[in-house]
UniProtKB/Swiss-Prot annotation:
This is UPF0298 protein Sez_1612. Keywords: Cytoplasm. Its main location: cytoplasm. One of its GO terms (cellular component) is cytoplasm. The lineage of its organism: Bacteria, Bacillati, Bacillota, Bacilli, Lactobacillales. Belongs to the UPF0298 family. It is found in: Cytoplasm. InterPro entries: DUF2129. It comes from Streptococcus equi subsp. zooepidemicus (strain MGCS10565). It holds the Pfam family DUF2129.
Length: 94
């Protein structure tokens, strides 16, 4: 049966957009911002350490960040509607 592969996103900041094609061999390209010069790629979580090290060594890469999407709690329990707070009485000044 099909096993779901654990994936993680990497945000890769580049010096020049022309080098984006060179990074695509490391994972699946999800988004390329030409204006801000960064890429979002997805890789297998088990290969993250070695690919992160390889990508960081490339001369045209400015910075690599690991996505924090896995750290976000997605369990929403209860009512998401917030009740307005009642106004508090101000103490009298005398």
């Amino acid at each position: 049966m099909f096993q779901k592969q654990q994936r993680i996103g990497l945000v890769i900041y580049l010096y020049y957009n022309r080098d984006a094609r060179k990074v695509m061999k490391y994972g699946d390209l999800y988004y390329h911002s030409r204006r801000s010069r960064y890429l979002v790629i997805y890789i297998n979580k088990e290969d993250m350490e070695e690919k992160l090290k390889d990508i960081s060594r490339l001369t045209f890469v400015k910075e690599v960040k690991v996505s924090a999407f896995d750290d976000i709690d997605c369990d929403f329990v209860g009512n998401l509607h917030r009740e307005p707070l009642e106004p508090q009485a101000l103490p009298e000044q005398g």
